[in-house]
Amino acid sequence: MARGPAGKNRGVSKISKWYKADDEATPFHRRQLKKATATKLRNDIAPGTVLILLAGRFRGKRVVFLKQLKSGLLLVTGPYKVNGVPLKRVNQAYTLSTSTKVDLTGVNTAKFEDDYFGREKARKNHKNLFKAELTEEQKKKETERKNARKQDQQAVDTPLLAAVKKVEFLKNYLASKFTLNNNDRPHEMKF
């Protein structure tokens, strides 16, 4: 290494003293791509666990964990009638698990996978590049999708609300928002 100002090493490589007699092509090894695997579910999260959302539009809300999707995201719901959180996907890094559990018997989550939450993209109008508008067909499909979503939300919430009503104060607990004050120490709290 050559030394530069103030005695620091600079990235200059020396030429080797000896040269190979035969020029041989050195084999080029490609890196093996890692297979995408679903994120492992945290130990403290199990179906029926009440989670606190830490980021996003619903931060501070308490939700019920239903299942883990193939992508590794968590499927959660408020229930919507209690605290306004619909069926949604959440990354488990942005959740805080509590010791509270809800009985999920009768809740059917088989139809909910990652494609259920997909949307149709709006086509850009070539005349006006800044506005992307849905066609009439896409608008009809979107309204049908929204109506189906409402029915699915109701189908999940009905047995869930029945289970919530069985436990005293659980409905109020789910409806209340999670907050911290200045002197609170979250690492010492038990949720």
From Swiss-Prot:
Name of the protein in question: Large ribosomal subunit protein eL6
UniProt key word DNA-binding: no
Family (UniProt): Belongs to the eukaryotic ribosomal protein eL6 family.
Superkingdom of origin organism: Eukaryota
GO molecular function: RNA binding; structural constituent of ribosome
GO biological process: cytoplasmic translation; ribosomal large subunit assembly
A Pfam family this chain is assigned to: Ribosomal_L6e
GO cellular component, one term: cytosolic large ribosomal subunit
Keywords for the protein's UniProt record, in alphabetical order: Ribonucleoprotein, Ribosomal protein
